[in-house]
Amino acid sequence: MCVVSTKQMLNNAQRGGYAVPAFNIHNLETMQVVVETAANLHAPVIIAGTPGTFTHAGTENLLALVSAMAKQYHHPLAIHLDHHTKFDDIAQKVRSGVRSVMIDASHLPFAQNISRVKEVVDFCHRFDVSVEAELGQLGGQEDDVQVNEADAFYTNPAQAREFAEATGIDSLAVAIGTAHGMYASAPALDFSRLENIRQWVNLPLVLHGASGLSTKDIQQTIKLGICKINVATELKNAFSQALKNYLTEHPEATDPRDYLQSAKSAMRDVVSKVIADCGCEGRA
């Protein structure tokens, strides 16, 4: 097994009526949890990293880890650039071996968004790299980028088709009421908008900001065309809270191989639930 593109993963999901979860990882332990759980459940998953994660861990290191784990667990894995904004940064990582990219120019006016995304698509497709882009903008914080709720806006269905055709992207991230981070109360997702987008666009659709969504809402979005579900904050929260609890209860603990186990276990529960919600168990 090897590192693969997400294009075939998402096309399979679109045909099969399920979604592939993209889990944001931050270090060796969080990657281990995702890969081990996915392998045990025979589920397709995407290993996602923001620019901050790639800076923290190193592109070559992350690629080597994903490749090694794909072979160790005999499980196909994709490593994905999440919310990357700079062409040169994306190009360097693609040349290093990354085969799935999200170029996020959603903060730009429509025409400039198209122009920026098309530049990345034209480059990436030369390397058989799949490209995701976003139309509309989610509120909340992702890495060090903060978008106020007042500045967030939903995806326009008619523009979505123009955007997809003009850029040549492989998947489209939509804004239908989710936000980055955890929710203080259940969000009101615009399912009718999503259904309308699906009628205008034949590409696999992507939902960001899925941390904390109910099983019912996730499964409804999948029925309406979502093929990729992004989860980040919920993983971090489970991992960090379990770690804090363990160290509070065991102040004498000094061995990371011991005190990280409870954190991994808590995160594993979240990964397992998301895989179940996505309906992708046994689909790898």
Swiss-Prot record:
Zn(2+) binds at H83, H180, H208. Pathway: Carbohydrate metabolism; D-tagatose 6-phosphate degradation; D-glyceraldehyde 3-phosphate and glycerone phosphate from D-tagatose 6-phosphate: step 2/2. Keywords: Galactitol metabolism, Lyase, Metal-binding, Zinc. Its EC number is 4.1.2.40. It catalyses: D-tagatofuranose 1,6-bisphosphate = D-glyceraldehyde 3-phosphate + dihydroxyacetone phosphate. GO terms for cellular component: cytosol. InterPro entries: Aldolase_TIM, Class_II_FBP_aldolase, FBA_II, TagBP_ald_KbaY/GatY, TagBP_aldolase_GatY. Dihydroxyacetone phosphate binds at G181, G209, A210, S211, N230, V231, A232, T233. Binds 1 zinc ion per subunit. The active site is at D82. Its cofactor is Zn(2+). One of its GO terms (biological process) is galactitol catabolic process. GO terms for molecular function: tagatose-bisphosphate aldolase activity; zinc ion binding. It holds the Pfam family F_bP_aldolase. Forms a complex with GatZ. HAMAP family: TagBP_aldolase_GatY (MF_01294). Catalytic subunit of the tagatose-1,6-bisphosphate aldolase GatYZ, which catalyzes the reversible aldol condensation of dihydroxyacetone phosphate (DHAP or glycerone-phosphate) with glyceraldehyde 3-phosphate (G3P) to produce tagatose 1,6-bisphosphate (TBP). Requires GatZ subunit for full activity and stability. Is involved in the catabolism of galactitol. Belongs to the class II fructose-bisphosphate aldolase family. TagBP aldolase GatY subfamily. This is D-tagatose-1,6-bisphosphate aldolase subunit GatY. It comes from Escherichia coli (strain 55989 / EAEC). The lineage of its organism: Bacteria, Pseudomonadati, Pseudomonadota, Gammaproteobacteria, Enterobacterales.
